[in-house]
Amino acid sequence: MVRLKSRYILFEIIFPPTDTNVEESVSKADILLSHHRASPADVSIKSILQEIRRSLSLNLGDYGSAKCNSLLQLKYFSNKTSTGIIRCHREDCDLVIMALMLMSKIGDVDGLIVNPVKVSGTIKKIEQFAMRRNSKILNIIKCSQSSHLSDNDFIINDFKKIGRENENENEDD
């Protein structure tokens, strides 16, 4: 008997600011805080799954929707961090990621971006990655508030550091 192989997708919901008044002296911490905020109570596991299924049906038709829905599960979602983990079949992973990226509303909440962050074969590794990622974001916010570097220098140094860490993680996998 062949084992059922599944993939886990870590995603985040980003809420871009709707006001057009942008100050020139906005720090990176302010940008991170304005985009990464808690989800409203309307965004629940049930509403996210309904919206994913609706997106699959609209964009892939009956065949794609039926193909992806066979193993589609939302394993975890936190309203405080606006992050979640989806379980899907290995062959349908790309289709589910496409459906996530094409979503622009969940329930009554409109104007959001669903960002697939990482795909993994085990839920343990995706949870570890999510914890490391959240601690990095918190460190970025703390360091940028206390740093005397300009925002551009801080952003460039931070992207170089994250790029080196991602190369090391890819070598470990």
Swiss-Prot record:
EC number annotated for this UniProt entry: 3.1.26.5
Keywords, in A-Z order: Cytoplasm, Hydrolase, Nucleus, rRNA processing, tRNA processing
One Pfam family hit: RNase_P_Rpp14
A Gene Ontology term for the protein's cellular component: nucleolar ribonuclease P complex
Reaction it catalyzes: Endonucleolytic cleavage of RNA, removing 5'-extranucleotides from tRNA precursor
BP term (GO), one: intronic box C/D snoRNA processing
Extra remark: Present with 2230 molecules/cell in log phase SD medium.
PANTHER family for this protein: POP5 HOMOLOG, RIBONUCLEASE P_MRP SUBUNIT
Protein family membership: Belongs to the eukaryotic/archaeal RNase P protein component 2 family.
Assembly notes: Component of nuclear RNase P and RNase MRP complexes. RNase P consists of an RNA moiety and at least 9 protein subunits including POP1, POP3, POP4, POP5, POP6, POP7, POP8, RPP1 and RPR2. RNase MRP complex consists of an RNA moiety and at least 10 protein subunits including POP1, POP3, POP4, POP5, POP6, POP7, POP8, RMP1, RPP1 and SNM1, many of which are shared with the RNase P complex.
Role of this protein: Component of ribonuclease P, a protein complex that generates mature tRNA molecules by cleaving their 5'-ends. Also a component of RNase MRP, which cleaves pre-rRNA sequences.
Protein name (Swiss-Prot/TrEMBL): Ribonuclease P/MRP protein subunit POP5
Species this chain originates from: Saccharomyces cerevisiae (strain ATCC 204508 / S288c) (Baker's yeast)
Gene for this chain: POP5
